[in-house]
């Protein structure tokens, strides 16, 4: 087996190792940026370890090369993705820098406006250097913050070094308090601590920390797993507090900048304003200022979230896959560990001591989500990326909100600019609002008060279109969210809601299924690595399908009202869960073909449920259209019209079927007879539980469409009064392939002998009009028969299958061939000591003589008889019993007769062949009744009647003695035979009582006896019946 390793040279292996190490080094440079710290030798060692493990584990050269190439390609694609991510980060950083520049330009414009009005502020007794100093401080902090954000975006780390806060000038107003973080900012700070990467300077202070851990949740998990010392925990706690302080300082700086912005945007009024105007401006409510501050804080927080999003995305929500990764016992352990974690955090003061049950449950869910995510990473399960469609829509909404807030901020900034403009400057035209106020003052009227959030004031008539066109374009480009929600609701399919009775019935069925779990054996050692990988990949690829079908179980019960269907689906679900739970641990219970069959069943259930929901929606839409076309119609009129249409469809389908007219008339005369279910062919579903066979349910209902290859062209079936017979022979022939998997399954082939009879289960009562499936009590029986796709109400009429008869003939031929082979095998086993019984029994089948009319010539040995009839003391093994159950015939020996009736047909099957085929073996004869052969004459016990001196070999003639030993007795070449001319006796092949000629009668046609050569013509081969040429010459 190691010959293939000699074909790979060390140079090729070293080349693979070099490629892997180079890719790892490139990825380290890309992710680390300028401060990337990696050792090429270590990377090369890790690449060598991977290559050596792969070299030792592979079974062939092709597997080794394929796995190595796939690994290199995957790493290369990951490198390309990292490069693309870095490009996006650079583009975002450039965009942020441009935004900061635009903001600085706006602030410079404001500063220019402030300098123009500084002389007037000094006239009022306000020092001019206050606003200038605040503006300079703001500019410096904005530059530092922009540089810090660009540097953190390029290096992949955020806020590695705390920037020193600029000292506040002593000339600020005395009433400005030291800014504090709000409750919302504190909560946001705690959330950022969970997802923000820890700077390398802080990580290096934590002792014994393995590489690759960069966040606090990872450190918490590592500490719970490795149990560090108390000294290490104290150092880690100090590092955590230091990291928290750094983030707190950055938040305080941001709040400082926000407060400065608000103070800059509220300058004093000019000297030439009247006292009333100054009073009105001083009487602006403080609520307006607080609203502006909150809006600016929210805007900056959202910008920071957007900046952090490409680097630190929130972990994806994978808690729904908890059952797929952990068992029930492990889930309980995780729950207890989450409780202990909350207690430890409360003791250390990181969480408040008085948490209610909902808050505790939220923290436990987050902890379990982290554990599921890590487990999925360890097992190699694909993890859904957080950039889903919902998050993209949220990002778009946030961007729209940002744009709206920016526009509001610009409008709010324009208000103080207009108020700051001196009225005596000839270069700037006065606003219309101020002109109106001056006119009212001249007329002795009161000035209009300033209304908070009153809208955008018009500084100039030329600027009006620019301020209005932007929100108008945004409103036209993005539809309102209410219309989008309505469109989404219209596109969704309406699902009927189960009642309390339905849920109770489902719980009862689930309890019945869980009482009898499926017992599967561990076949991990019998599977190859490729088969195991196939099972894993198939289970991972169809997880969404499994969860979708499980969520459809109540809906399926609402549509079918059949407990047997739901019971089988619950069995499949229980089987799938067990297979997936064990496969995650590396234990495999079934083969890949069984997984394919389970997936096939899930797909059929999903397609069936989806199709029925679509039909239900179409039915509701037709009813609405009819009501819209004729609003005077009542609900009963709509139901009656719909029933007429459905009856016409059913009549067309019934006319296309080949049924007896009295049966059709009887069905049409009793339209209100309730039929509770459908009994389809039972040999098509999976027998997942051995308890089902033990209980011997008669009339087990299964979905016929699960095995139908023409599922896409489903049409309603017409009820047939004849019950469909089970076909165990077909199940035995088609189920042999899966005998080793531990689950007897059936091949998914269509069964066209489906019939419609009353179901064993009782149908729950349904309120009339609650569902389109059951609109009125006067529905025809054909409409209430079956929930399957072939008997739905609004199904199109069935089209005749032109190949139906051919398919039935092929099925019967296959069953007949299987029975014929089984009969031949049993005859070889029973008649192992009796060749004549083997010939006569086979010949009786050719002549259409039944088994009960053929007596055996030799008595069957007692051990064989006990084994066949099952009368012996030794019981059959499981394998023998399984083979007997799958046998298409039932074998027994009764009254010295071998009986082998068919399991698929009660009547005895005919294996007769034409008489011409029998006589073809004997060409000169037209009828086997006239076939007469020369039998071997009877001889005495002592055959040596000749003189010993004449024919007996002497002592010296050893050659004669050796030749005589080779001669067979009773053969034509035996020298010790009587004279063949003395006794000439013929015997017919068939007894005379059957119409054959007797021994003394002459045949009507020349027989072989009449054409016999003379006795002295011993050299003629015409008499040698042992020679095949004799039969060929006839």
UniProtKB/Swiss-Prot annotation:
Keywords: Activator, Nucleus, Transcription, Transcription regulation. Residues 962-971 have a biased composition (Basic and acidic residues). CDD domains: gal11_coact. GO terms for cellular component: mediator complex. Coiled coil: none annotated. Residues 101-123, 138-149, 157-183, 281-312, 413-441, 459-490, 655-675 have a biased composition (Low complexity). One of its GO terms (molecular function) is transcription coregulator activity. Residues 101-124, 138-183, 281-315, 413-497, 655-682, 712-804, 951-1020 are annotated as: Disordered. Gene3D superfamilies: Coactivator CBP, KIX domain. SUPFAM superfamilies: Kix domain of CBP (creb binding protein). Belongs to the Mediator complex subunit 15 family. GAL11 lacks a DNA-domain, it probably complexes with GAL4 that has the capacity to bind DNA. Association between GAL11 and GAL4 may serve to expedite phosphorylation of GAL4. This is Mediator of RNA polymerase II transcription subunit 15.
